[in-house]
């Protein structure tokens, strides 16, 4: 019986096609087709399937790949392995590894070359390197691995950041072959101090594993350097392990994934980080009442939202649920605030990002940041992950390709030790193929240091580092705010002013206010505007609750509530006229009083992964 025709591939160019076996050797055989969007799998023998189950592996679900070899010297086959994170029936992701046997040649060297050809092609596609069907696939096509500095706040959210980082983040980015150093922060503004003295030429990106507060420290540290114009071009990223995780929610939305929270959001953002790619990021330069200045990537809030944010700190152990509880309490004691909001309306044309700050998505390797000014002082990297083999959990491999763990296979070459369900005591450690991950200029894979065996001890009184809510340190460097007159000076005539009683005022840059609150559904990372939302007094508690509930899916503006207002602006000034209240910038409490801000389009660079996919069910 002739095998069925090949499955129709996606509307993209086929890169490779071939026949592979599985492990063990007497298992099924498969026809594999690699396109720019997916790996197509069709079983050929013993029973061909016209539409095999799990026959399409989207590259959006793949973190990395590798080649393996048998521990048996008589086995001349080589093995091609991919690490995937498909969505389960309940929506969450689960790790699955698929392994295929390259056995079409008579010698191990030839089979190994074929397995490496597939691994090289898949790695190039994952990292954004364009390939064509008639192109020769060689290791020289592989981009250099970016070297990432990963900062973990072990006190963030519910205090689970370190454990989640080791359980989910480290294994995935190790599978992707990324090079990184892992550092635990130990106090407030520790991350800011680190990046202020960082040698930028040693890194291609800084990633925070926490909530939005740690990235706020990093961003303001980069902009508080004499070489801020170079420093702010350092790509920054966030892996959510905090309470709000607003920017991570926006990154998840930008990547085309459905809205999720918790570990699912962490896995989605980790996958996007592994894929590479970045996007220009607008920043707000915020001038406070004292004249000091800080920079925001998220929001300025006054009224109900800032009250909920700050007053819910006492429920920090609840994680993101603290905001729900805080909102309920806030609705029960709803306050109004008198103030004056003035803004410079955005032009009809979208603002263009600053030239030179955009990273081409076609090349996944990150642009090297320029070296810092000679005057910068290098701070020691405390609790760094740097010098010992990095443990990488390896659960059982699943079909198609490998229906069971592979006790008799090992990854080719030498490198970090991989532990898990790969055999009994005395088996050789698993290690990545040295020819696969990178070109000859590749950086060394990250490794673990003895001082990073666990998170620092948390205060016994509360279990978490108590937030100080002191005013953030002001930045003395940064771009000129050419749209803003000094606070207290009259505003130009082209500004619009609204005065009255407000329940809340929000100026937000990205789409999300929390991981599951889409406050500005049409916002983009580089649209050049701040999205102003306000709610006037007179609104009922029920109507405000409806707005908050609709905000989960970004439908609040379609409610037609007359108390809800919106404007897109390039700059704004907020003057609270009520003597007492709370103001927050990116969730951090700042001094109360007049405040103004200006958008600086595309000033920073955000690690986002590829964009353009539709939300996945």
Curated annotation (Swiss-Prot):
Catalyzes the phosphorylation of sphingosine to form sphingosine-1-phosphate (SPP), a lipid mediator with both intra- and extracellular functions. Also acts on D-erythro-dihydrosphingosine, D-erythro-sphingosine and L-threo-dihydrosphingosine. Binds phosphoinositides. In contrast to prosurvival SPHK1, has a positive effect on intracellular ceramide levels, inhibits cells growth and enhances apoptosis. In mitochondria, is important for cytochrome-c oxidase assembly and mitochondrial respiration. The modification Phosphoserine is found at residues 358, 364, 384, 386. Induction: Expressopm decreases upon treatment with 1-methyl-4-phenyl-1,2,3,6-tetrahydropyridine (MPTP) which is used to induce Parkinson disease in mouse model. Disruption phenotype: Mutant mice are viable, fertile and have normal longevity. They show reduced SPP levels. Mice have decreased fat mass but increased lean mass, they display increased energy expenditure compared to wild-type. Aging mice are protected from metabolic decline and obesity. 52-week old male mutant mice have decreased weight and fat mass, and increased glucose tolerance and insulin sensitivity compared to control mice. Double knockout for SPHK1 and SPHK2 causes embryonic lethality. Between 11.5 dpc and 12.5 dpc embryos exhibit cranial hemorrhage and die at 13.5 dpc. Interacts with histone H3. Interacts with HDAC1, HDAC2, MBD2 and SIN3A. Interacts with EEF1A1; the interaction enhances SPHK2 kinase activity. Interacts with PHB2. Pfam families: DAGK_cat, YegS_C. One of its GO terms (biological process) is intracellular signal transduction. PROSITE patterns: DAGK (PS50146). The active site is at 212 (proton donor/acceptor). It comes from Mus musculus (Mouse). It catalyses: a sphingoid base + ATP = a sphingoid 1-phosphate + ADP + H(+); sphing-4-enine + ATP = sphing-4-enine 1-phosphate + ADP + H(+); sphinganine + ATP = sphinganine 1-phosphate + ADP + H(+); (4R)-hydroxysphinganine + ATP = (4R)-hydroxysphinganine 1-phosphate + ADP + H(+). Transmembrane segments: none annotated. Substrate binds at residues 210-213, 309. Its main location: membrane. This is Sphingosine kinase 2. Optimum pH is 7.5. ATP binds at residues 153-155, 185-189, 217, 242-244, 316, 322, 586-588. It is an enzyme of class 2 (transferase).
């Amino acid at each position: 019986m002739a095998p069925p025709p090949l499955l129709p591939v996606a509307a993209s160019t086929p890169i490779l096609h071939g026949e592979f076996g599985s492990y063990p050797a007497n298992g099924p055989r498969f026809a594999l087709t690699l396109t720019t969007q997916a790996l197509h799998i069709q079983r050929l023998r013993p029973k061909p399937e016209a539409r095999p189950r799990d026959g399409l592996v989207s590259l959006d679900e793949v973190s990395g790949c590798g080649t393996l070899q048998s521990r048996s010297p008589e086995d001349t086959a080589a093995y091609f392995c991919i690490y995937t994170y498909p969505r389960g029936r309940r929506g969450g992701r689960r790790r699955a590894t698929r392994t295929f046997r390259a056995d079409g040649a008579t010698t191990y060297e030839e089979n190994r070359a074929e397995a490496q050809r597939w691994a090289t092609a898949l790695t190039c596609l994952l990292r954004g390197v364009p390939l064509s069907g008639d192109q020769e696939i060689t290791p020289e096509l592989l981009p250099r691995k970016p070297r990432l500095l990963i900062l973990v706040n072990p006190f963030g959210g519910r205090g689970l950041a370190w454990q989640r980082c080791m359980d989910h983040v480290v294994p995935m980015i190790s599978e992707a072959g990324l090079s990184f150093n892992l550092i635990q922060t130990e106090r407030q503004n520790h991350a800011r101090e680190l990046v202020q003295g960082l040698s930028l030429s040693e890194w291609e990106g800084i990633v925070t594993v926490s909530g939005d507060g740690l990235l706020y420290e990093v961003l303001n540290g980069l902009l508080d350097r004499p070489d801020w114009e170079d420093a702010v071009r350092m790509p920054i990223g966030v892996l959510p392990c905090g309470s709000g995780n607003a920017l991570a929610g926006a990154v998840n939305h930008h990547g085309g994934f459905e809205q999720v929270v918790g570990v699912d959001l962490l896995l989605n953002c980790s996958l996007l980080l592994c894929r590479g790619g970045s996007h220009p990021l607008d920043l707000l330069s915020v001038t406070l009442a004292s004249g000091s200045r800080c920079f925001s990537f998220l929001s300025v809030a006054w009224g109900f939202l800032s009250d909920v944010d700050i007053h819910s700190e006492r429920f920090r152990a609840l994680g993101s649920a603290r905001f729900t509880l805080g909102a309920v309490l806030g609705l029960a004691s709803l306050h109004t605030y008198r103030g004056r909001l003035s803004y410079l309306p955005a032009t009809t044309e979208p603002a263009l990002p600053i030239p030179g700050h955009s990273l081409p998505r076609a090349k996944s390797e990150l642009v090297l940041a320029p070296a810092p000014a000679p005057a910068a002082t290098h701070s020691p990297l405390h609790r760094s992950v740097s010098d010992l083999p990095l443990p990488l959990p390896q659960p059982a491999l699943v079909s198609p390709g490998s229906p069971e763990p592979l006790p008799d296979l090992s990854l080719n070459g030498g490198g970090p030790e991989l532990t898990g369900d790969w055999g009994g005591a005395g088996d050789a450690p698993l290690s990545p193929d040295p020819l696969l991950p990178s070109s000859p200029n590749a950086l060394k894979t990250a490794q673990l240091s003895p001082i990073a065996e666990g998170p620092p001890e948390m205060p016994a009184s509360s279990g978490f580092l108590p937030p100080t809510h002191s005013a953030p340190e002001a930045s003395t460097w940064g771009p000129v705010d050419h749209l803003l007159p000094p606070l207290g000076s009259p505003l130009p005539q082209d500004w619009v002013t609204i005065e009255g009683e407000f329940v809340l005022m929000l100026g937000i840059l990205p789409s999300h206010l929390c991981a599951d609150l889409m406050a500005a559904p049409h916002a983009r990372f580089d649209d050049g505007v701040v999205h102003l939302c306000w709610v006037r007094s007179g609104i009922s508690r029920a109507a405000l609750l409806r707005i908050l509930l609709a905000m989960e899916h970004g439908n609040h503006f379609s409610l037609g509530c007359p108390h809800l207002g919106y404007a897109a602006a390039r700059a704004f000034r907020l003057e609270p006229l009520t003597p007492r209240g709370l103001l927050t910038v990116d969730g951090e409490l700042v001094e109360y009083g007049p405040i103004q801000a200006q958008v600086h389009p595309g000033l920073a660079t955000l690690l986002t992964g590829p964009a353009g996919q539709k939300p996945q069910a």
